[in-house]
From Swiss-Prot:
Compositionally biased spans, kind Polar residues: 22-31, 247-259
Role summary: One of the primary rRNA binding proteins, it binds directly near the 3'-end of the 23S rRNA, where it nucleates assembly of the 50S subunit.
NCBIfam families: L3_arch, PRK04231.1
Taxonomic lineage: Archaea, Methanobacteriati, Methanobacteriota, Stenosarchaea group, Halobacteria
Protein encoded by which gene: rpl3
Protein name: Large ribosomal subunit protein uL3
Length: 338
């Protein structure tokens, strides 16, 4: 006898399953304003995976103090640049952009991505922001930052990836002064200025694109069995729904776009933040090459293929107290090509 009921196949929490509008991921929420003012995000390029041997530092664990092997993703994270401070104001309809304070030092390739302002008065823009702060209408403060692909030889692109990164922590006036200092000093900031090894971070990326796929691969429905499969349609669904309502519901698993979706994974532990070629495997990472600059080792996997942009954010819902500076005793350099 067939099973009378079961949970539906595939999650509806990720719909609509369509292509991401941009390869640069976006964050819709940010951590709380605790601690000192600072930038709440960074970005890098995914190189590949390897494994490390580290000492288990989880309190009360049966394996505490023992060595264990952990898979890690290697992400190349050269310094980023902040070219402007964008201030938001609180309105009855939510936060709206108020004004921007731009730097006068721009990367030579930045005009490939955005129009660099020529006639800009940063003093007038700063005064407008401070007036909004005194009136109590100042909302979020965000830096317009961009990557520097020139610093990553393995990524064959010249066009910088531009994104907004929130400035959090401390009071509003402290955040404003901190953001203005970053912009005035040239805007360069590094991964270890924001994160520390052992902390938890949320990682966002655009997954591998797989094109149009059928309902079996896209939703995980069962293939037809027995005489139902002998009709010649083993990988199709049985029907599109009932007679009434006389329409096809959006919950019916059908073929369509698979992959190339933005996904955010929470609470990924940062195993190591360093610089050099230590994590590079023999022969280089497949489809990437060698890592010979600032890098970050993230525990586990990260969305997206090699060379794709990955964004970091301090964990918004940390499920554990950070255990800083894990003891890494070995980083595998075994070739991924056998």
């Amino acid at each position: 006898m067939p099973q009378p009921s079961r949970p539906r196949k595939g999650s509806l929490g990720f719909g609509p399953r369509k292509r991401s509008t941009s390869e640069t991921p976006r964050f819709n929420s940010w951590p709380s304003d605790d601690g000192q003012p600072g930038v709440q995000g960074f970005a890098g390029y995914k190189a590949g995976m390897t494994h490390v041997v580290l000492v288990n530092d989880e309190p009360n664990s049966p394996r505490e103090g023992m060595e264990e092997t952990v898979p890690v993703t290697v992400i190349e994270t050269p310094p980023m640049r902040a070219v402007a401070l964008r201030a938001y104001e609180d309105t009855p309809y939510g936060q709206r952009p108020l004004t921007e304070v731009w730097t006068d030092e721009f990367h030579s390739e930045l005009d490939r991505t955005l129009d660099v302002p020529e006639d800009h008065d940063p003093d007038a823009a700063e005064e407008q922001i401070r007036d909004a702060h005194e009136a109590g209408d100042l909302g979020d403060l965000r830096l317009i930052t961009h990557t520097v692909p020139d610093a990553v030889p393995s990524v064959p692109k010249k066009k910088p990836d531009v994104m907004e990164t929130r400035v959090g922590g401390g009071s509003v006036s402290d955040r404003l002064d901190h953001a203005l200092d970053i912009v005035e000093d040239g805007g360069e900031h590094a991964m270890n200025d924001i994160f520390r090894a052992g902390e938890y971070a949320d990682v966002a990326g655009v997954t591998k694109g797989k094109g149009t796929q059928g309902p079996v691969k896209r939703w995980g429905v069962q293939k037809r069995k027995g005489k139902h499969a002998r009709q010649g349609w083993r990988r199709r669904i049985g029907n599109l729904g009932p007679w009434n309502p006389s329409r096809v519901r959006s919950t019916v698993p059908q073929q369509g776009q698979t992959g190339y979706h933005q996904r955010t994974e929470l609470n990924k532990r940062l195993i190591d933040i360093g610089e050099g070629d230590e994590p590079t495997v023999d022969g280089g990472f497949v489809n990437y090459g060698e890592v010979d600059g600032p890098y970050t080792l993230v525990k586990g996997s990260v969305p997206g293929p090699d060379k794709r942009l990955v964004r970091f954010r301090p964990a918004v819902r940390p499920n554990d107290q950070p255990r800083l500076d894990p003891e890494v005793r070995y980083v595998s350099n075994e070739s991924n090509q056998g």
